[in-house]
């Protein structure tokens, strides 16, 4: 398996527990989006429904906590939440402050 989120952290780790991590997205992806973070599930799974109900709740709790922290820190006009997985088919969420 050649999954970038399984073989590397995916960015600077801001926080992690035994199930997921929050990373700060850097480089070209983040130039126009200060505060751009990803919440990445540690175990390789392609779809949210591959997680147990308890794991889905845990992951979404971390996503919402990340959103709340970014709102407090940056006071953006809007926060975008997205989970697509087309380029990297590994469960992860984008949490993007918009200004």
Regions inferred by a protein language model and the residue ranges of each:
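HIT superfamily nucleotide-processing domains
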Residues: 1-99
């Amino acid at each position: 398996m050649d999954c970038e989120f399984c073989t590397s952290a995916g960015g600077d780790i801001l926080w992690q527990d035994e199930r997921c991590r929050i990373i700060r997205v850097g480089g070209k992806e983040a130039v126009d989006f200060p505060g751009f973070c990803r919440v990445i599930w540690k175990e390789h799974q392609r779809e949210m429904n591959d997680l147990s109900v308890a794991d889905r709740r845990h992951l979404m709790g971390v996503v919402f906590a990340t959103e709340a922290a970014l709102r407090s820190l940056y006071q953006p006009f809007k926060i975008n939440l997205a989970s697509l997985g087309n380029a990297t088919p590994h469960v992860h969420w984008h949490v993007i402050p918009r200004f």
